[in-house]
Amino acid sequence: MKKQGVNPKPLQSSRPSPSKRPYGASPARELEVEKSALGGGKLPGGARRSSPGRIPNLKKRKGLELKVVAKTLLDPFQFVRNSLAQLREEVHELQARWFPSRTTLSIAIFVAILHWLHLVTLFENDRHFSHLSSLEWEMTFRTKMGLYYSYFKTIIEAPSFLEGLWMIMNDRLTEYPLVINTVKRFHLYPEVIIAAWYRTFIGIMNLFGLETKTCWNVTRIEPLNEFKAVKDWEILLAFMLV
């Protein structure tokens, strides 16, 4: 007589038991069996499995949306950029067609000479350099004007160009007691080049016995004393520097 409520069959676990590998089965076949055993059941709560290509597709979609937004925002700026590039090309074409390199250089030299003459006239009309002594017109240079002119004068008054260059490259007066290279610190390359040209020009003129200075006596009202004014290329080059 059988007892009620007792199941004669043994209870089976809901967890799939690992399948035994048959003799002679290949590793690929075993991998397929494991995949079928793991993926055969349903996910709880009505969840569904995500396909492997879903995440890359979402990334591609977001990337396309960002590109569309960026293009929409940058379209006006791209138009301006293209317009400026086209205008720049047209200007270069006009310059190459109308102004060759020699013509451009000639115009630049002519404008530089006019600017130099303007400065000379301006300083003469404003401060009367021709009626000032050397010390007085040097004192009219203010701040950086006097600083740069002092280095220029150091080079041209040195016994030789190399000695003057060494003096400004090992300067102790500007930031005493430190020794600094003023050529590198204050970018004195224009002053060095002009001083070299000045010394070369003066040397050539002295070699041929040509005068480079014009001197005259200036009589001033007392208590100012009479002095000898000197006009030379040093003063003219000073205007170019300041």
Swiss-Prot record:
Enzyme class: transferase
This protein's GO CC annotations: membrane
Broad class of the protein's primary localization: membrane
Keyword Lipoprotein in record: no
Bilayer-crossing regions: 103-123, 149-169, 190-210
Membrane topology: Multi-pass membrane protein
EC number, UniProt record: 2.4.1.-
GO terms of molecular function: glycosyltransferase activity
Tissue and organ distribution: Brain, heart, placenta and testis.
One Pfam family per UniProt: Dpy19
Region (Disordered): 1-56
Keywords tagged on the record: Glycosyltransferase, Membrane, Transferase, Transmembrane, Transmembrane helix
Subcellular location: Membrane
KW Mitochondrion (keyword) present: no
Note: It has been suggested that DPY19L2P1 is an inactive pseudogene from which DPY19L2 has evolved by duplication. However, expressed transcript sequences derived from the DPY19L2P1 locus are known to exist.
Entry function: Probable C-mannosyltransferase that mediates C-mannosylation of tryptophan residues on target proteins.
Family: Belongs to the dpy-19 family.
PANTHER family in the record: C-MANNOSYLTRANSFERASE DPY19L2-RELATED (PTHR31488:SF6), DPY-19-LIKE 1, LIKE (H. SAPIENS) (PTHR31488)
Listed name of the protein: Putative C-mannosyltransferase DPY19L2P1
Gene designation: DPY19L2P1
